[in-house]
């Protein structure tokens, strides 16, 4: 077995030799085999001439065993081994040669031998062997060079181990006494940033500064890129200002990196300032930099400034591309200037399909479906451009927006017939459209058609169906869709659970809704404020305030903030339970928590105070409401009028009625019916009739409740045949 292995060694050397001429070239070095020519001196060996040397090398490269190889040479030098290892030998062969030569008496491996062998090992990912060789080098007293470690770092990068470079750089200094320079730091930083180890890169940079190693322009560029990648743009900008302290001047690449990140984070003004600085520093931005700024301006509807930036592009010799025009057109469409976008479109020499799609989508978004179809027709007939899935999706969306889901479905079938495969979004629009129209069966058919087309429905599509089923109280079917989602490779999200929980609460299945909340948490889906508000409302409707409070506590514990809806539900529940003082305390807490109360919040509390007989407090609260900047509406006055009349203060109720008229708030049916009811109950039927006449003159239209109030007061209850009256009157 040993002889066979050795034969394979020599055979590998022979097979991988590129040519006999190269062999002869290395054979010419065999003069160093003699004692006088070798690096190591030592032993007497017969002098070998050119022809004999060639023969010796031929013997070496033949499939001899290792014993024959030993007999062919008196001694091999590190330089000869270095040249041998440079040949394309495999790792095992190279290691065996390395071990064999190292066993020669008086032989000592050189740095070059180690470097070429470590290079081969690194290319093959043999990093444990590399670590052993580095220790061996240290034990042999070989002086390390930085280039060796940089080479290993590159190999770690290629193997996908960027983090190992920091370990190696620490060992350079602490283990192998090789002090890293800016070269090593730059390589490590570059590898870390390309490997998305941005935080580690920042730490390495600060370590570099603490060791007084001067950073280069390349160093700053890489570290700024790392900061921008994790949205620490302020740190990157701080580095920009520190560059001059280290004798570095920012170049175009650094400015472009920062401008891109600022624009991406919607810090457009700073991006503009940096662009101006870039011009002053003599750096030339590229087209992408201009496009970044133009996009940022368009995001904030600063279209005129974006157009001026295009002019600056032209002055600088950059021709706006489809991306530039696309950003501008999209910005114009966003602010409703679709016709201006159309005018810009006709200035583009050869518009690509993305430009057409931008304009079509702009028309569709603003309800101009016919204009969108005209652009599509022009695109096909005049420019010969075939519509893509984005084009068709815009049309489908346009028909969906108009409620013409049937026509949208026809567009989908048409695109498929023309060889354009619909995507998930195409089908999801239709599913949502049919669900909104209450055509759930059609929506389900579209979902099945989508699956037949080889596409997996997404969470949005399933959510549309579940929500639609729940709204129609078809809970079992909604649950079935919910169970189908994992089988289709689709994970339910918070909206899925919220729809089901809301549906269960609507049919008073709160127990099952709570189970679903527990399942939701165990599945790793975080319940939000909407989830808890739905359940809290359900308990409060049933008068179970204690259970509602438990959920509020859980809500706070889980980190979901109480919003105005939560507070309103609780205040309303407390008022219904007659705990008005607690409701008012909760209202004050809402104010302390920074929630500005809306009219809804105020009206709930006013209504609660009035129903509890605390009319004066309600009137005072209405005045406080005005002082806080809220404007009382008709609901506010209706609650106060009802409260005053309930307290026997009908005159005050009528005064409040005149007040709301004076403030320009038109009374509604509830206002008239409330006053007429209390007037009739107090025996003031004639006044109620006068109030009705006054209301009719002002445009009030009585309803069944209005006539019922009057009839019950005029005609005795036992003699009133309501059915016959309504049949005769209506």
Curated annotation (Swiss-Prot):
Protein name per the record: Pentatricopeptide repeat-containing protein At5g64320, mitochondrial
InterPro entries in alphabetical order: Pentatricopeptide_rpt (IPR002885), TPR-like_helical_dom_sf (IPR011990)
The organism of origin for this protein: Arabidopsis thaliana (Mouse-ear cress)
Pfam families assigned: PPR (PF01535), PPR_1 (PF12854), PPR_2 (PF13041)
Assigned keywords, A-Z: Mitochondrion, Repeat, Transit peptide
GO CC field: mitochondrion
Record family assignment: Belongs to the PPR family. P subfamily.
UniProt xrefs under PROSITE patterns: PPR
Transit peptide: 1-18
NCBIfam families named among the record's database cross-references: PPR
Keyword Transit peptide set for record: yes
Keyword Hydrolase tagged: no
GO biological process: mitochondrial translation
Cell location: Mitochondrion
PPR repeats: from-to residues: 110-144, 145-175, 181-215, 216-250, 251-285, 286-320, 321-351, 352-387, 388-422, 423-457, 458-492, 493-527, 528-562, 563-597, 598-632, 633-667, 668-702
Coarse class of the protein's main subcellular location: mitochondrion
Gene3D superfamilies, sorted: Tetratricopeptide repeat domain (1.25.40.10)
